[in-house]
Amino acid sequence: MIMSVCLPWLARCRRFLIVSLAFAMLLLGIWGTLPFSLSDHGTAIAALEDDRYDGNIFVVYAGNGSLVPPRLNLRESFERKLPVILVYYLDDSKDCKQYAFIVSRMQEFYGRVASIIPVSVDSIPDQKRFRRDEPGYYYSGGVPQTVILDKSGKKIFDAQGALKFEVVDDVLRDLFDLLPRSESMELKQRTYNEFNSELVD
């Protein structure tokens, strides 16, 4: 008699425990697959101050999806006789994350007259020799690295680190024969008197 009363109740309890245990395991399984930042902080956070991968740095930190992939590759830029700005980067480098906005500013001011080519160093083949029209030719091993080539392909600038915009801007102003920043915040080309090469106001 007692067994006949207890058995259905035990069966129901057992079923409830199995369902509860399965649900708890499911929740723990989902929680364990969440990104580290989400399980730690409760929200997904893209951070400038760490070396964690958050996505393409130009999209996430510069709000600029037009830089990658570049409009022209290095060979095409040489064929069109365009000056080139090569920027070597890694998506999981905090220095590159901080530099992404500066690269976007370069495009804003010089994107119509120069070929801006961001190069993920992960995409450079592991080989010893490169041709001049391959990005690996100019890469020196660190990120971020900025290399500027004139329209003949001659290297006129090569520096590593997250540079200030003004550093690159000075090189490009000289390359494009623009007024110094002290004389013009806007990018205006120098004007010359037809009788001499003095700067005209």
Swiss-Prot record:
This protein's record includes keyword Mitochondrion: no
Keywords carried by this UniProt record: Membrane, Thylakoid, Transmembrane, Transmembrane helix
Gene Ontology cellular-component annotations: plasma membrane-derived thylakoid membrane
Gene3D superfamilies: Glutaredoxin
Principal location class: membrane
Membrane topology (UniProt): Single-pass membrane protein
Residue spans crossing the bilayer: 16-36
Domain of life: Bacteria
InterPro entries the record matches: Thioredoxin-like_sf, Thylak_slr1796
Compartments (UniProt record): Cellular thylakoid membrane
Disulfide bonds: none
Name of the molecule in the record: Thylakoid membrane protein slr1796
Species of provenance: Synechocystis sp. (strain ATCC 27184 / PCC 6803 / Kazusa)
